[in-house]
Amino acid sequence: MEFLDEFPTMGRSDLRDLKKSIDGGFREFSRTYGEGLENFFDPLLHFLVWFERLLVNTPWPIVLGAIAALVWFGARSVTMVIATIVCFMVIGYLDMWEDTMATLAIVSVATIICIAIGLPVGILMARSNKFQAAITPVLDVMQTIPSFVYLIPVVMLLGIGKVPGLIAVCIYALPPMARLTNLGIRLVDKEVLEAATAFGADYKQKLFGVQIPLALPTIFAGVNQTIMMALSMVVIASLIGVAGLGVPVLRAVSNQYLALGLMNGLAIVALAIIFDRVSQRFGRRMQSHREEGAGH
C-alpha cells in the first residue's frame, strides 16, 4: 500500500543530477554567447536610455504639451486631453514625474517592439494553419508561465539592467498582439475577400487593402492588451534594475509604506487608462474613416 500512499518520484540523486545538468548547460551557454547577446542588444539599450533621458530632461511643459497633442491626435476629444493633463499635473505635483517618464519610456518602447513582432506573427498565423498550430503553444507558454520564472534566464544571459527588464516585459506582453491580429484577420467576411478577388486583387492587396483595415478594431484591442500587460510588468521588471514607478511600489511593499505604494500604484493605473482610452478611440476613428471612404 506504500505505492498508493506516496506518489512515485525520481530518486533524489538523479533529480539533483538532472537539475545540475540543466543549470550547467545554461551557464555554459551564457558564458559562450552572453557577451554576443549583450552586444546585439546594445543599440536597443542606447535607444531606451536616450528616450528616457529625453523625457526626463526635457522641460515638463514641453513634455506635457507633446503628450496632450498625441492624445488629441489619437482621441480627438477635448475631455480626454484635459483629463490627461490633469492626471500628469497631479503625478508631477506628488513628485512622481521622473519615475513616470521612465515608466512611459519602457512601456512605449516595449509596445513598439511587441507591435513590430506581434503584427507580422499574427498575419502569418492567419495565413497558415500549420504556422498557427506551431506558434500557439509558444504563445501559451509565454502568456501562462509565471513572470518570475523567465526573469531567471534573462538575468543569467544579460545581467541586471534595462534591457533584461525590457525583454521580460516584451515576452509577457507580446502574445495578445499576435493572437488578436490573427483573430481579426480570420474574422474578415469571406464574401468581402471573394469580392476583392473578383476585382483582381492579389494577396498583398487583399491583406493591406481589405483584411487589415477591417480587422483594425480587433488589432487595436491587441494593442490595448499589450499596453496593459506591459504596465502590469513594471513592478516585476523593477526587481532586475528597471527604473520607474515599480521601484517605489517595491519599496513600499518591503517597508509597509501604504501611501507611497498607493500613490505610485494609482499613477500606473492612470497611465493604463490614458493609453487604453486613446488607443481605443484611435482604432474606432480609423475604422469609421475607412468605412466613410468605402461609402464614397
Question: Model regions: which residues?
Answer:
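Transmembrane-helix boundary motif in ABC transporter permease subunits
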Residues: 69-73, 91-98, 110-139
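Generic hydrophobic transmembrane alpha-helix motif, especially the helices
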Residues: 106-109, 114-117, 123-126, 139-173
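Glycine-rich helix-loop "coupling/hinge" segments at transmembrane-helix boundaries
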Residues: 156, 185, 230-271, 283-296
